[in-house]
Regions:
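N-terminal ligand-binding/catalytic initiation module
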Residues: 1-156
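Transmembrane alpha-helical segments of multi-pass membrane transport proteins and ion-pumping complexes
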Residues: 139-142, 198, 258
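Short, well-ordered coil/turn residues at beta-beta hairpins
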Residues: 134, 257-258
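Short, exposed beta-strand "edge-strand" segments with a Pro/Gly-rich flavor and a Y/T-containing core
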Residues: 22-27, 106, 110, 177, ...
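Rossmann-fold NAD(P) dinucleotide-binding segment
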Residues: 144-151, 242-251, 261
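Glycine-rich, charged/polar anion/phosphate-binding loops
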Residues: 49-54, 199-200, 240-242, 261
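Short beta->alpha junction loops/turns
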Residues: 26, 110, 137, 161, ...
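Glycine-rich phosphate/diphosphate-binding loop of Rossmann-like nucleotide-binding domains
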Residues: 75, 82-100, 158, 162, ...
Length: 261
């Protein structure tokens, strides 16, 4: 099978894209439409105005997630821009719907700065019951997530961090059990120190892992490196002779690859 052709055809036919919007209420008669829109729609508007929590009662807010990106870290492709990231965001929406029956709007934001991105999300947040951040480059992603959690009253989840970390932790627990090894005793090497790698390592540390070495394209993260951000520094080892991936892999028990390199 020609994978490229199959993937492009899948996205093109029978109509472009992977998502559509369907009504959850009957809209066949004049009476239906007068309830769906004016004049009937004014009644839930007034109820929500009196008590904002009624939005969860009379609208789809409680089952609607925003999958949001700026396209700066798309899959292993890098900074592809907001528009080119749309197929991935639609794909994540499909997963939400297929496996949890949660509705999604995919939103791709052209933002020049992290603060501009944050403000855009804050401005549209009333529509949604939760925010799923996706494919945002590190270290900006850490700041964006932290600020949105401060500003919003709905859940904020960065999939590349937390989704990956949960899956990696679950897999490692099972693998270590099969090998009769303990998390606090094994040597773990990460290739990749971006959003996914850092989040995985932080979760494993919180679970008891003590010997973790992070490696990125410039080598081992140690505290002598001047180009580390605050999350990297927290995971960096003390300066030593361990400088490369080959060095780090000596006597390693676990290798976790979270890099396109």
């Amino acid at each position: 099978m020609d994978l490229k052709k199959a993937a492009l055809d899948y996205h093109l036919f029978p109509k472009p894209g992977k998502l559509s919007v369907e009504s959850s209420k009957p809209c066949l008669t004049q009476q239906d439409l007068s309830l769906a829109y004016t004049p009937g729609v004014a009644e839930p508007v007034k109820e929500i105005h009196k008590d904002p929590s009624n939005a969860y009662k009379y609208t789809n807010k409680g089952n609607l997630i925003a999958v949001i990106t700026n396209g700066t870290a798309v899959l292993g492709l890098g900074n592809m821009g907001a528009l080119a990231s749309k197929p991935v965001m639609e794909g994540k929406a499909v997963l939400f719907k297929r496996f949890a029956d949660i509705d999604v709007f995919d939103i791709e934001i052209n933002a020049k700065t992290s603060d501009e991105f944050i403000q855009t999300v804050v401005n549209i947040a009333p529509t949604f019951g939760g925010i799923n951040l996706e494919d945002i480059a590190a270290p900006e992603c850490f700041y964006i997530e932290k600020e949105l959690k401060k500003k919003l009253d709905i859940p904020v989840f960065h999939d590349d961090q937390h989704g990956t970390a949960v899956v990696v932790a679950a897999g490692l627990i099972n693998a270590l059990e099969i090998q009769s090894k303990k998390l606090e005793e094994v040597k773990i090497v990460f290739l990749g120190a971006g959003a996914a790698g850092c989040s995985c390592a932080r979760l494993l540390k919180s679970m008891g892992a003590r010997n973790i070495i992070m490696v990125d394209r410039q080598g081992v993260l140690d505290k002598n490196r001047s180009n580390l951000h605050e999350i990297n520094i927290d995971l960096a080892i003390e300066p030593s002779a361990i400088k490369t991936l080959d060095d780090a892999m000596q006597d390693a028990d676990v290798f976790i690859g979270v890099s396109a390199a």
